[in-house]
Design a protein with these regions (language model features):
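Active-site-proximal loop/hinge segments that shape catalytic or ion-binding/gating pockets
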Residues: 289
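Beta-strand->loop->alpha-helix junctions that form or flank phosphate-binding loops
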Residues: 72-75, 87-109, 125-129, 158-164, ...
Length: 306
């Protein structure tokens, strides 16, 4: 259906995100790709992709084809690089990796990103410290499309694109004062990125968390990173057959901080907002699962209107 829609809209360029790995992903039916972007390889979907970073990377690198320019994540784990280099060599193509020495995350307001990358000074539409690396990749992708394939993408267009980028449920700020933030992080890497973003914003345990996870995710490691950010956590059961119950998550969360199981997502958000208000805290963060994010987002948008 997506390809049909793209065809009907007569798109000049299409950005496809793989859903599961790359080699056997549905998006890999496209015979020729201009650019293959490999973001950070982490531990997720291990029951399908493998239990080591090199196995997972080998699946991800399956999107690399002959004639494709490869843009790689600046801080790619060393263990993941072997399969990526092998796939690029077999496809007779080169790898572009943004130079970390050329990338600076500039200080700005809370939960706002500004970067300087190779002379491109830009405000980013996406919060999250990790988005600086993604922005550098986006710049390299645009430059590759210009250099290798003749697409006329101006510097102003690149800067505007970085500023306009939005992704629902990806460290999404729905209200600033008091804070309502939604993030679909569902693995340890995502939890670390959210925690790093909240820490950099100097909230210092001045937040209330609403947390729901799936039972097959590494939620114990996620809790280790996220719990220090919260004065209290309300646990919920996401709307998914694979969900960990709010009660089971609460048992684990209470080893880290004050935790209470809520009857529903709506109940948790209501209690979290009230707790933050009564204790003069900065706000509420809902995170742990995209299933939770889908249910929570309409409720948070309604709350943000008050």
């Amino acid at each position: 259906l997506a390809f049909l829609w793209f065809a009907r809209e007569k798109c000049d360029l299409v950005v496809l995100e793989t859903g599961l790995g790359g080699r056997c992903d549905a998006t890999n039916v496209v015979p020729h790709k201009l650019v293959a972007a490999i973001t950070k390889i982490g531990y997720d979907h291990m029951e399908v992709l493998g239990d080591t970073l090199d196995k997972i990377a080998a699946e991800k690198a399956g999107i690399i084809k002959e004639g494709t320019v490869v843009v790689n994540y600046p801080d790619q784990p060393a263990e993941a690089m072997g399969p990526i280099l092998t796939a690029a060599a077999e496809a007779h193509t080169s790898i572009i990796t943004p130079d970390k020495d050329d990338l600076t995350l500039l200080r700005g307001k809370r939960l706002e990103n500004r970067i300087d990358y190779g002379g491109y000074r830009a405000a980013l539409g996406l919060p999250g410290t990790h988005q600086a690396n993604h922005a550098a990749m986006a710049v390299e992708i645009a430059l590759a499309l210009w250099r290798e394939f003749g697409y006329d993408i101006s510097d102003d267009a690149i800067l505007q694109g970085l500023a306009d980028a939005r992704m629902p449920a990806r460290i999404e700020v729905l209200r600033r004062h008091p804070l309502l933030l939604l993030d679909g992080c569902h693995n340890p890497d995502g939890a670390k990125m959210l925690a790093a973003t909240l820490t950099r914003a100097d909230f210092e345990e001045n937040l209330v968390g609403v947390l729901g996870v799936l039972a097959d995710k590494d939620y114990k490691d996620m809790l280790s990173d996220l719990a220090p950010c919260f004065a209290k956590i309300y646990t919920v059961t996401p709307n998914c057959p694979r969900a960990l119950s709010a009660e089971e998550l609460q048992k684990e969360a209470r080893f880290h901080t004050d935790a209470e199981a809520a009857d529903s997502v709506a109940d948790a958000i209501r209690k979290a907002v009230d707790y933050a208000d009564e204790n003069n805290l900065a706000g509420v963060v809902v995170c742990g699962s995209l299933y939770l994010a889908a249910e929570a987002r309409p409720l948070l948008l309604k709350e943000a209107e008050k």
